């Protein structure tokens, strides 16, 4: 009887430990996707969806919004993965999930790639190819061009890289309005240029 009680206690302890590890991992993943940035992506994309002419169902709109946020999360994770060495040397960033060791670099890279790939492919099926291609371009622009090139070569990196932050509402517009692409592109181009005038 006593042995059985010990076994039950051991199993309960193992379950509690596993649950705590899962919760901690999700907390670290939440930090990894840069929630402040993602909330802005969701907000601007939602505004675009509300303004765009469309007869799509709320379900399709909701899925498209989630996929855009997932793509943005994937690129944010890839950004953190690439900057992990630099982050480990700065007081402001050394406690981020990867440099602190709370999430391994390989795990972060895998999640970032999965989020990015899945969001692009799924947006193609749930929305259209134009939105999918533009989402792929945005992910590559931010996680490769901005993160790996601009940040380390020019003080104007935010100005040029800011295009990645301006594209989610364009993707949202296109994802539910189909071919009506030129108006949002002109609008975002004008807004981006005016915002960074010197």
Give residue ranges: language-model regions.
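Multi-pass membrane catalytic core of lipid/isoprenoid biosynthesis enzymes
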Residues: 92-133
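Conserved small/polar residues in nucleotide/adenosyl-binding loops
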Residues: 191-198
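Transit-peptide-like, low-complexity N-terminal presequences
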Residues: 1-26
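Acidic (Asp/Glu-rich) catalytic motifs at the cytosolic membrane interface
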Residues: 72-99, 194
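Interhelical loop and helix-boundary elements at the membrane-water interface
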Residues: 25-37, 97-108, 145-164
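Membrane-embedded alpha-helical segments that form the functional core of polytopic membrane enzymes
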Residues: 43-44, 51-82, 133, 140, ...
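Small-residue-rich segments of transmembrane alpha-helices in multi-pass membrane proteins
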Residues: 44, 160-174
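The first (N-terminal) embedded transmembrane alpha-helix
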Residues: 34-48
């Amino acid at each position: 009887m006593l042995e059985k009680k010990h076994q039950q206690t051991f199993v309960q302890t193992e379950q509690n430990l596993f649950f705590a590890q899962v919760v901690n991992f999700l907390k670290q993943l939440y930090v990894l996707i840069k929630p402040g940035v993602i909330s802005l992506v969701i907000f601007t994309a939602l505004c675009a969806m509300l303004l765009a002419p469309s007869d799509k169902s709320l379900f399709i709109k909701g899925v498209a919004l989630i996929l855009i946020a997932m793509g943005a999360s994937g690129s944010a994770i890839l950004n953190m993965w690439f900057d992990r060495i630099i982050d480990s040397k700065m007081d402001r960033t050394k406690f981020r999930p990867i440099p602190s060791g709370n999430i391994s670099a390989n795990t972060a890279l895998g999640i970032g790639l999965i989020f990015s790939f899945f969001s692009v492919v799924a947006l193609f099926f749930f929305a259209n190819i134009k939105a999918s291609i533009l989402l792929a371009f945005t992910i590559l622009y931010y996680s490769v061009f901005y993160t790996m090139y601009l940040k380390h070569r020019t003080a104007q990196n935010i100005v040029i890289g800011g295009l990645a932050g301006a594209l989610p509402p364009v993707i949202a517009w296109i994802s539910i309005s189909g071919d009506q692409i030129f108006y949002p592109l002109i609008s975002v181009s004008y807004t981006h240029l005016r915002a960074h005038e010197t």
